[in-house]
């Protein structure tokens, strides 16, 4: 199960945050704390980052978000905010939800449609880049 953290009053307009890869829903807290006096901020954490949980599918994550929103009485989202790979999940949410949404803000979404042949060519290079980052203990990023 996904974990959900909320800030603000449930009766205020709702903002739903989708976090980036490598962080939890709490990464949106600095912004949510600023907005909590006027908005009900919902910060889900993907099951990938929930201890003892197993990621099933994007559809399952969306189902969990929908169920949580319903349990909180959310009938309208003023804003959906998503960063990096979270934008991918947010886009899937947006295309399947029946909830009305006022605004959407994506920061660094990954929406490129890369063909199978190109992926096959690029995979070894990506693997090497990840290994290089591991071997350098992250020092490669500071150069």
Q: What feature does the model see in each segment?
A:
Residues 21, 40, 63, 105-119, ...:
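Membrane-interface segments of envelope glycosyltransferases acting on lipid-linked substrates or membrane lipids
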Residues 5-51:
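Conserved HGGG/HGGXW glycine-rich cap/lid loop of the alpha/beta-hydrolase fold
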Residues 130-143:
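Helix-loop "lid/cap" segments that line or gate small-molecule binding pockets
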Residues 95, 101-132:
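Flexible "cap/lid" loop of the alpha/beta hydrolase fold
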